[in-house]
From Swiss-Prot:
Keywords: Ribonucleoprotein, Ribosomal protein. InterPro entries: Ribosomal_bS16, Ribosomal_bS16_dom_sf. NCBIfam families: S16. This is Small ribosomal subunit protein bS16.
Length: 90
């Protein structure tokens, strides 16, 4: 089972709101997920992002792969830098 960290679309039509979730790569975009690790609202200025950093780092260390968009969100929040430092400075 390949696990991905990706965005799950919520909100109404033309008013998107996303949950950052950990899900099986075979499940549909808005389908079943394993854990919710944050939220992302692109409509606010600036876009509001709330992430559970410890849980995200735990999932990344266990092999979860972030989607491209989620990887960009994590990079802006500094999570990818912490992950790479922890992974390669052992």
């Amino acid at each position: 089972m390949s696990v991905k960290i990706r965005l799950k679309r919520m909100g109404s039509k033309k008013r998107p709101f996303y949950r950052v979730v950990v899900a099986d790569s075979r499940s549909p975009r808005d389908g079943r997920f394993i854990a919710q690790v944050g939220t992302y609202n692109p409509l606010t200025e600036p876009a509001s992002v709330k992430l559970e950093e410890e849980e995200i780092l735990n999932w990344l260390n266990n092999g979860a792969q972030p989607s491209d968009t989620v990887k960009n969100i994590f990079s802006k929040a500094g999570i990818m830098k912490k992950y790479h430092e922890a992974k390669y400075t052992k």
